[in-house]
Structure formats: structure tokens, C-alpha cells
Amino acid sequence: MPTILILNGPNLNLLGLREPHIYGESTLEDVEKMCHELGKQHNISVKTFQSNHEGQLIDCIHEARNKVDLIVINPAGYTHTSIAIRDALLGVSIPFIEVHISNVHAREKWRNHSYFSDKALACIVGLGAFGYEVAIQHAVRNLFPKLTS
């Protein structure tokens, strides 16, 4: 059974509360529940982790080595600043999909740069919490088709 790690960065624990006009009304718990349910439907194990601390995110990535087949990451504010998280992802050689709830390209100019996009299998932006579902569906159809049918 394939395993996907859903990794969420800083302030995503405030989903549903923080700027709902930008990030929507779904909570992190709602997003994680949806990911677990979708995983069950497709015979995929889903693990979730959120932290506001860069080192904890890096430790989680390191611990995923040889245990996880795909990482779906919303690096949040670290998108534009964390070479360390990028290096951790590249160091463990786990493919990853970058997800952003808002359309970062339609926001402040400094949000346009990502340290992850050039190495990601795919980048999903601006679809709200549905972006996580799209990432899992992409994995089902393109990465794990024989393992999930």
C-alpha cells in the first residue's frame, strides 16, 4: 500500500480562522479528514503533520525516508524562505507535490517565488482546500495506478 505524507507549514493550523476570504473556511482538521478518507477509497495510507517550526518540518521529512512514497507539501510562509526544507526534500529523494490554498502568483510580488516549484512533480495553487484532493488524485492516476486499483 503506498503512503502519502501531507505536510503543512506555519499558520496552517489556523485554517478556517485566518483570513477566510483568502484561505477559505475549511479547517486543517477538515483538510486532514478529507485526505484520510480519499486515501482509504484508493487503498493509500495517508499520514499528516503540521508545524509552525522549520526544524520540526525538516525532522518529519527526514523520518519519512524509506517510509513514504510521496509528500504533498504546503510549505506556507516557508515557500519563499526555506532552502533548508528544500534541501531536506531533495536529500530524502521522495517525490513531492507543492500545494498552496491561495493563488500565490496573484498576491504580493514576494509570494511569487518558491524554493520548491522547480523540483516538485506538480504545483497546485489557488484551488483552496480542494488542491490537496487534486494532489492525491494525481498520485492515484499517475504515480500509483497499479497499486491503488
Swiss-Prot record:
PROSITE patterns the record matches: DEHYDROQUINASE_II (PS01029)
Entry keyword set: Lyase, Quinate metabolism
HAMAP family: AroQ (MF_00169)
Catalytic machinery residues: Y23 (proton acceptor), H100 (proton donor)
Function statement: Is involved in the catabolism of quinate. Allows the utilization of quinate as carbon source via the beta-ketoadipate pathway.
Similarity remark: Belongs to the type-II 3-dehydroquinase family.
Origin: domain of life: Eukaryota
InterPro entries, per the entry: DHquinase_II, DHquinase_II_CS, DHquinase_II_sf
Top-level EC class as recorded in UniProt: lyase
Catalytic activity: 3-dehydroquinate = 3-dehydroshikimate + H2O
EC number(s) stated in the UniProt entry for this protein: 4.2.1.10
Pathway(s) served: Aromatic compound metabolism; 3,4-dihydroxybenzoate biosynthesis; 3,4-dihydroxybenzoate from 3-dehydroquinate: step 1/2
Pfam family, one: DHquinase_II
GO biological process terms, semicolon-separated: 3,4-dihydroxybenzoate biosynthetic process; quinate catabolic process
Positions contributing to substrate binding: N74, H80, D87, I101, S102, R111
SUPFAM superfamilies linked: Type II 3-dehydroquinate dehydratase
GO molecular function terms attached to this record: 3-dehydroquinate dehydratase activity
Entry protein name: Catabolic 3-dehydroquinase
Assembly notes: Homododecamer. Adopts a ring-like structure, composed of an arrangement of two hexameric rings stacked on top of one another.
